[in-house]
A protein has these predicted regions:
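Solvent-exposed interaction patches of small proteins and small membrane subunits
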Residues: 1-125
């Protein structure tokens, strides 16, 4: 339980940094790239929090971000719409790690407010 609280605190701090950059009203390419970087580390903190939560509260051992989303859905912590968005978020996170394209960066940046809202709703922010 204590480990979940620690991870949740890290995830909430990471989310706050993402929300800070998303609040900018006239984002530049540099701000867009900063937001994507903040999304990457926020995502890592969040999925690891979910993984630990499922292990400690539900006895489920999941080894991947998609497994974590599926586990949270199966145990009722996410509804179908949230799980679908969560899986899309995993896919977008994977794309940010393996490719760079101006168009793709713009598309992912447009999705970040939805992802931040989903993360915030699940982490108590």
């Amino acid at each position: 339980m204590e480990r979940v609280k620690e991870r949740l605190g890290v995830a909430q701090k990471a989310l706050a940094t993402l929300q800070e950059v998303l609040a900018e009203t006239n984002p530049t390419v540099i701000l867009r790239d900063a937001a994507i970087q903040r999304f990457e580390y926020t995502f890592e903190a969040v999925w690891k929090t979910g993984q630990e939560f499922l292990r400690s509260h539900e006895g489920l051992d999941v080894g991947s971000p998609k497994g974590t989303v599926h586990g949270l859905f199966q145990t009722g912590y996410l509804n179908a719409r949230q799980a679908e968005l969560g899986l899309k978020m995993v896919d977008d996170r994977n794309l940010t790690s393996h490719t760079y394209s101006e168009g793709l960066s713009g598309q992912i940046f447009e999705e970040l407010p939805k992802y931040a809202t989903l993360i915030g709703n699940q982490s108590g922010q």
